[in-house]
């Protein structure tokens, strides 16, 4: 699993998850920053892709690979690790330190049956 994130006030905001499965476990910490927020449209298939790519290019949003503990240069392509979004999402585990869930974070995630 990989995570797109941004840093706000020293805390990580998860903007997107990437995985082949249908479950996401948001870590309590990304790249040394506590995860306190799930961004708007994080699991929605209706995210503004142009804005997101612009933020990736400007390094406002970064990609983190927990397996290596390192940042990646670009967004994974769908064949390597697809975005976990929309009808694909069935289970999401949130960290205890999460304080905010952004607007439409689970928009059209109609298969979502478990949120922990």
Stretches with model-predicted labels:
Residues 1-11, 19-36, 48-100, 110-116:
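Structural signature of tandem-repeat unit edges
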């Amino acid at each position: 699993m990989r995570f797109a994130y941004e840093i706000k006030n020293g805390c990580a905001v998860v903007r997107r998850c990437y995985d082949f499965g249908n479950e996401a476990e948001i870590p309590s910490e990304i790249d040394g920053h506590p995860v306190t927020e799930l961004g708007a449209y994080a699991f929605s298939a209706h995210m503004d892709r142009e804005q997101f790519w612009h933020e990736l290019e400007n390094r406002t949003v970064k990609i983190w690979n927990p397996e290596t503990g390192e940042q990646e240069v670009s967004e994974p392509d769908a064949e390597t690790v697809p975005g976990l979004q929309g009808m694909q999402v069935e289970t999401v585990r949130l960290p205890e330190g999460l304080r905010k869930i952004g607007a439409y974070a689970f928009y059209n995630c109609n298969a979502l049956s478990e949120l922990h």
